[in-house]
Regions:
Chain A
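Mitochondrial intermembrane space
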Residues: 1-144
Length: 144, 76
């Protein structure tokens, strides 16, 4: 396979396999990836803020991919059943979190016990309970 | 035929036909989405993720939580 001009410009790069997880499991794991990979994600976003050129942030991008792959592997080892049921519920419900709270709670407790990761939504106003922790939310699904 | 319930016969026919239409429509939508409800209110982000799912699994609604990428989709 011949190299493109851009590939020749950056030189040979270490190979990191892309993450093979599809959209529903990623959405289910999203806040845990945010908690686990915070430093790498922030590094990558700051790097992108400097320059949108793809060649500029290859190293930070590799780190993000490795961290996310690591977390998904750990999630599957420790909390497979809750993880699978949560993203199956999301698949049935247009990937909307508020419709899958009953299945999300066991996943959050399992992740906290086994891996110590807590789902926090950044930007929640001070003093307000996290939306996923409210027992009887006003906006909820039609059926119980 | 002059019976008290004669108007209910075409009403029942209408209800049945609407029901059949709705059921067949539901079946066609679900059949294209691997027997799951279709996605709606899709943004550009969602469309890009669905295209990525297609590259990874071969179908727009195919899902897998396996972090190992199959070789045919090795460049996402």
């Amino acid at each position: 396979m011949s190299t493109t001009k851009e590939q020749q410009a950056v030189g040979p790069q270490p190979h990191v396999a892309e993450l093979g997880t599809t959209s529903a499991p990623l959405k289910s794991a999203a806040f845990f990836i945010g908690a686990y990979c915070k430093e790498f994600n922030e590094d990558f976003m700051l790097c992108k803020a400097e320059s949108r050129d793809p060649a500029h942030c290859l190293k930070e991008g590799r780190r993000v991919t490795r961290c996310a792959t690591d977390l998904i592997t750990k999630m599957r080892e420790n909390c497979l059943e809750q993880f699978e049921s949560h993203w199956a519920c999301l698949e049935q419900n247009n990937h909307q979190y508020y419709r899958c709270r009953t299945v999300e709670r066991p996943l959050n407790t399992c992740m906290f016990e086994k891996l110590g990761l807590v789902k926090t939504i950044p930007g929640t106003p001070e003093g307000r309970k996290q939306i996923h922790e409210i027992e009887n939310p006003v906006l909820k699904r039609q059926q119980k | 035929m002059p019976v008290p319930w004669e108007a209910l016969i075409p009403s029942a026919l209408l209800v049945t036909m609407f029901g059949v239409t709705g059921t067949l429509a539901n079946i066609t939508f679900r059949a294209q989405n691997q027997w799951k409800p279709p996605r709606y209110h899709l943004e550009r982000w969602d469309e890009m993720m669905i295209a990525r799912d297609n590259r990874l699994t071969g179908h727009n609604r195919g899902q897998t939580s396996d972090p190992v990428i199959p070789s045919r989709a090795a460049s996402s």
